[in-house]
């Protein structure tokens, strides 16, 4: 059969009917199967970080996405929305970002679940969003600048029995803030918590003497050991004793029974998308776990000055259990947290 280049090629009846049959089969398939070959993710990810730029969350997220972006073959684009102890960023994520699997949040589950319990914002966990990729476990600690007059945690408590000490914290609803309030209750000492909206400005406040002491997650402090000294840790064990001059646990120093207080950062996504797209969500979670185990991420994390021992991956179930535990802890300390606001 021949035809002119200016004419349409002839189509046989068999080919035409076959084409209709194939089209009909595609139309009959569920959308998820009909477009199974459409690659997810289809574009870059947009990430909200609900704290200020330049802090520990940003450093950790960027080190992580160096490995994750290669697995997903997409880049990560960040915006920073501090304020109201993280509430502003979460409300923006839940209410204004499309639940399409390409919008993520990278948050600090500990303080942000405490904020959720205390401030009672207009969104719901886990109905509106879920955490699925925990990156680390970060114990809360008390620290000072290296030339501080306070050389150990007992000297801090003795001074705070005479007058309230100013404590720089990243935010009031935070495990480290609960630790300071619980320390005050246990020892009869007094602390004035001053929130600075993120780790970086908190370090600056301690460094320039605006605050007497600081209380933050330990890994960021350990990345700045040339400037700061850890005095005590809110956990049953100080796993970094060798690089903190054997700083004691708070409970061992005072015979108290303060619960373990640690933060865990994690990726979050809209719950309705995750539940409606189980295969794509499984891809997101499995590649997150692969990225976490990769030498590239661990090398990048170490380059931030943070100790690799704190890296511990957690899936959706692990994250949900931790988040719910933080909500219960916040309810226990809600009266004193509310009094500090």
Predicted segments with their positions:
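N-terminal secretory signal peptides
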Residues: 1-11, 15, 19-28
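C-terminal lobe and pocket-closing loops
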Residues: 220-293, 340
């Amino acid at each position: 059969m021949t035809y002119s280049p200016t004419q349409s090629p002839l189509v046989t009846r068999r080919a035409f009917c076959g084409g209709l049959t194939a089209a009909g089969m595609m139309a009959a398939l569920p959308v998820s199967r009909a477009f199974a070959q459409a690659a997810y993710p289809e574009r870059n990810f947009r990430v909200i970080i609900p704290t200020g730029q330049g802090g520990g969350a940003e450093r950790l997220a960027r080190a992580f996405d160096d490995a994750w972006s290669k697995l997903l073959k997409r880049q990560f684009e960040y915006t920073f929305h501090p304020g109201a102890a993280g509430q502003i960023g979460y409300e923006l994520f839940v209410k204004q970002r499309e639940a399409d699997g390409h919008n993520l949040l990278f948050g600090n589950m500990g303080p942000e679940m405490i904020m959720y319990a205390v401030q009672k914002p207009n969104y719901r966990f886990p109905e509106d969003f879920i955490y699925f990729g925990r990156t680390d476990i970060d114990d809360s600690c008390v620290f000072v600048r290296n030339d501080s007059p306070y050389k150990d945690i007992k000297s801090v408590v003795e001074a705070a029995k005479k007058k309230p000490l100013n404590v720089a914290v990243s935010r009031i609803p935070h495990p480290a803030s609960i630790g300071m309030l619980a320390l005050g209750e246990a020892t009869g000492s007094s602390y004035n918590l001053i929130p600075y909206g993120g780790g970086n400005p908190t370090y600056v406040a301690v460094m320039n003497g605006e605050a007497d002491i600081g209380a933050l997650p330990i890994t960021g402090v350990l990345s700045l050991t040339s400037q700061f000294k850890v005095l005590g840790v809110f956990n049953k064990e100080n796993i970094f004793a060798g690089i903190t001059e054997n700083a004691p646990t708070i409970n061992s120093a005072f015979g108290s029974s303060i619960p373990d207080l640690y933060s865990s950062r994690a990726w979050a996504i809209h719950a309705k998308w995750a539940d409606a797209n189980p295969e794509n969500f499984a891809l997101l979670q499995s590649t997150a776990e692969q990225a976490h185990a990769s030498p590239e991420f661990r090398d990048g994390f170490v380059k931030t000055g943070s100790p690799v021992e704190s890296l511990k991956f957690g899936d959706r179930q692990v994250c949900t259990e931790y988040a719910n535990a933080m909500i219960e802890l916040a309810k226990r300390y809600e009266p004193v947290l509310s009094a500090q606001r």
